[in-house]
């Protein structure tokens, strides 16, 4: 059970009361009808709102940005699916999609909102995702559910499997690559994902066990481990990677352990 001391409330539309009630009961969160919500204030309060169309995380502060939700059907991810850089994407290069390596089994141990997992699945990978925060898991699960209703997106998300919990407690067989994107304290004041980073900072926080995640990954029989890091951030465990794929705002530290193969 999680405890947010009324920092997170669960709200609902009439059509989704049962889902909202089950979630609030499972995780010990207060359930509030939309018409009974408290007045907005400067206090950090979030609603996990089960609306008629989606599950969304709403910042209930005065003058707050819009809601956070997962959308694989429209917007940036749909554009990347149709017009993206293909295997030229940094995440694709980092996991090793090149030449004869066309399909890999990837375990994303820190799924978040599923963006990188979706890019990899769109390129043919099978991605097993683990998310340990139940609020973030609920957002991602709902995004996957809605994507199954769109033929183009469904062909991608059918290669994505989501679990709630710790990836390394029950590590699945047949994984080629472990992908880690631990939360890191956000230093930039202006960002395209500012509202999401603020929400994650408030309800998730940084991952203090990021080093332990890499250590756990290194104990697995996998061929490669990829760690996504901000520019200037130290390497996890102080361990230098085999090589690094670097972009404008971040980098991918790649630990190449065995030769990759994939059909």
Swiss-Prot record:
It is found in: Cytoplasm. It catalyses: guanosine(1516) in 16S rRNA + S-adenosyl-L-methionine = N(2)-methylguanosine(1516) in 16S rRNA + S-adenosyl-L-homocysteine + H(+). Its main location: cytoplasm. S-adenosyl-L-methionine binds at residues 115-116, 131-132, 181. The keyword Transmembrane does not apply. InterPro entries: 16SrRNA_methylTrfase_J, SAM-dependent_MTases_sf. GO terms for cellular component: cytoplasm. It is an enzyme of class 2 (transferase). Gene3D superfamilies: Vaccinia Virus protein VP39 (3.40.50.150). GO terms for molecular function: rRNA (guanine-N2-)-methyltransferase activity. It comes from the Bacteria. Keywords: Cytoplasm, Methyltransferase, rRNA processing, S-adenosyl-L-methionine, Transferase. Pfam families: SAM_MT (PF04445). Its EC number is 2.1.1.242. SUPFAM superfamilies: S-adenosyl-L-methionine-dependent methyltransferases. The keyword Chloroplast does not apply. Specifically methylates the guanosine in position 1516 of 16S rRNA. Belongs to the methyltransferase superfamily. RsmJ family. HAMAP family: 16SrRNA_methyltr_J (MF_01523). This is Ribosomal RNA small subunit methyltransferase J. It comes from Hahella chejuensis (strain KCTC 2396). The gene is rsmJ.
């Amino acid at each position: 059970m999680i405890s947010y001391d009324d920092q997170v409330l669960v709200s609902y539309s009439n059509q989704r009361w049962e889902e909202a009630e089950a979630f609030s009961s499972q995780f010990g969160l207060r359930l509030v009808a939309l018409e009974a919500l408290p007045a907005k204030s400067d206090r950090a309060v979030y609603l996990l709102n089960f609306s008629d169309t989606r599950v969304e995380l709403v910042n209930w502060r005065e003058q707050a940005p819009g809601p956070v939700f997962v959308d694989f059907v429209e917007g940036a991810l749909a554009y990347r699916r149709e017009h993206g850089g293909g295997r030229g994407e940094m995440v694709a290069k980092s996991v090793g999609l090149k030449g004869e390596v066309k399909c890999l089994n990837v375990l994303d141990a820190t799924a978040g909102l599923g963006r990188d997992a979706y890019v990899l699945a769109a390129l043919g990978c099978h991605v097993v995702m683990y998310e340990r925060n139940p609020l973030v898991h609920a957002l991602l699960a709902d995004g996957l559910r809605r994507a199954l209703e769109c033929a183009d997106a469904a062909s991608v998300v059918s290669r994505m499997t989501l679990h709630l919990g710790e990836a390394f407690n029950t590590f699945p067989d047949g994984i080629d690559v472990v992908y880690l994107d631990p939360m890191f304290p956000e230093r930039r004041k202006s960002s395209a994902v500012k509202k999401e980073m603020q929400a994650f900072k408030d309800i998730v926080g940084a991952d203090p066990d990021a080093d332990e995640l890499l250590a756990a990954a290194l104990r697995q029989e996998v061929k490669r481990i990829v760690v996504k890091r901000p520019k200037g951030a130290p390497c996890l465990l102080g361990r230098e990677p085999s090589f690094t794929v670097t972009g404008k705002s971040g980098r991918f530290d790649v630990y190449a352990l065995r030769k990759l193969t994939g059909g």
